Curated annotation (Swiss-Prot):
SUPFAM superfamilies for this protein: Sm-like ribonucleoproteins
Residues annotated as domain Sm: 7-80
Lineage summary: Eukaryota, Fungi, Dikarya, Ascomycota, Pezizomycotina
Keyword Signal: no
Function: Plays a role in pre-mRNA splicing as a core component of the spliceosomal U1, U2, U4 and U5 small nuclear ribonucleoproteins (snRNPs), the building blocks of the spliceosome.
This protein's UniProt keywords: Cytoplasm, mRNA processing, mRNA splicing, Nucleus, Ribonucleoprotein, RNA-binding, Spliceosome
Species name: Neurospora crassa (strain ATCC 24698 / 74-OR23-1A / CBS 708.71 / DSM 1257 / FGSC 987)
Cited Pfam families: LSM (PF01423)
Cellular-component GO terms for this entry: catalytic step 2 spliceosome; pICln-Sm protein complex; post-mRNA release spliceosomal complex; Prp19 complex; U1 snRNP; U2 snRNP; U4 snRNP; U4/U6 x U5 tri-snRNP complex
Protein name as catalogued: Probable small nuclear ribonucleoprotein F
Length: 90
């Protein structure tokens, strides 16, 4: 199995106007919101943003700007995350 490096810019440009989940490097913080824009430094602007800490909803934030060096990963949000439904843990 070999590793093939991929340029993240086309992936991120395809996600503009889609709901994404962004995990921060620090702690267990995640943001779910609509990706509005991404600049050449990969700073990220989200709208309709919701904050989750330890997978628990902590509040709606609205417009958010996330500096590039704080991001651990970005993924397309699934239906449960965008609808506001939160999975209950036992």
């Amino acid at each position: 199995m070999s590793f093939v490096p991929v340029n993240p810019r086309p992936f991120l440009q395809d996600l503009v106007n889609s709901f994404v989940t962004i995990r921060l490097k620090w702690g267990e913080t995640e943001y779910v919101g609509r990706l509005v824009s991404i600049d050449s430094y990969m700073n990220i602007q989200l709208s309709d943003t919701k904050e989750y800490i330890n997978r628990k909803f902590t509040g709606a934030l609205g417009q958010v700007l996330i500096r590039c060096n704080n991001v651990l990963y970005i993924k397309k949000a699934d239906e449960a995350e965008t609808s506001g439904d939160v999975k209950m843990e036992e």
